[in-house]
Design a protein with these regions (language model features):
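Active-site-proximal cap/lid insertion segments
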Residues: 56-189
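Catalytic-site neighborhoods of secreted/periplasmic enzymes
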Residues: 1-83, 119-129
Length: 192
């Protein structure tokens, strides 16, 4: 819709668009994973629903070592917590680094952070400084809804969950700060 209206369109982050098909850009006719077809697949341009800037993956839930396929189909292996990296890419897009969009045209940018995502089990799911905010808090202060069973083993995972939410808030805030810095905050529709 936005693309048809003349907008530059960018997608950054996790998106289940393409089903498992043998579409590995580096090995035509092969799946991106040899052992089984996976939903974590490269999405060819004709299946991106009008997004002309692409930096995405399907279902790879390794938050501190994510990978992405770019617009040209090049796979990027990253060693950084995915929301921080995706915020960096969004800010780069807003600044139009690399001339990735026509600055005379309006743009639509969609950013989809993967965390918070289960299993919320370790520091691989969040940033340590965010976990430190919650690690020593009693579960009763975190699990305040009356229908939560605090005796379940996985109740303690709420600390990792809240740490992930805190980190995502910070990453999203950096994008909002960049919009404000560029004077685009009053001209932008932000949907969370």
């Amino acid at each position: 819709m936005f693309s048809q209206a003349g907008y530059n369109c960018a997608y950054i982050g996790k998106l289940h668009v393409d089903c498992p098909t043998p579409n590995d850009p580096e090995r035509p006719g092969k799946y991106v994973e040899d052992r089984v077809p996976a939903w974590d697949a490269y999405t060819p341009a004709d299946r991106r629903h009008g997004f002309d800037y692409w930096y995405s993956y399907g279902t790879y839930d390794v938050h501190k070592h994510p990978h992405y396929w770019d617009t040209e189909g090049v796979k990027h292996e990253i060693n950084e917590w995915s929301p921080e990296h995706e915020a960096d890419k969004a800010i780069s897009y807003l600044r139009n680094e690399g001339n990735v969009r026509d600055p005379k045209k309006p743009f639509f940018m969609m950013v989809s952070f993967n965390p918070p995502h289960s299993p919320y089990a370790s520091l691989e799911d969040c940033m340590e400084e965010d976990y430190d905010l919650y690690k020593d808090l009693p579960l009763d202060s975190l699990l305040i809804r009356p229908n939560v069973n605090r005796e379940m083993k996985k109740a303690a995972s709420v600390r990792y969950y809240f740490a992930s939410v805190t980190g995502v808030d910070r990453a999203f805030g950096r994008i909002l700060d960049e919009l404000e810095k560029q004077g685009l905050d009053k001209l932008s529709l932000i949907h969370i």
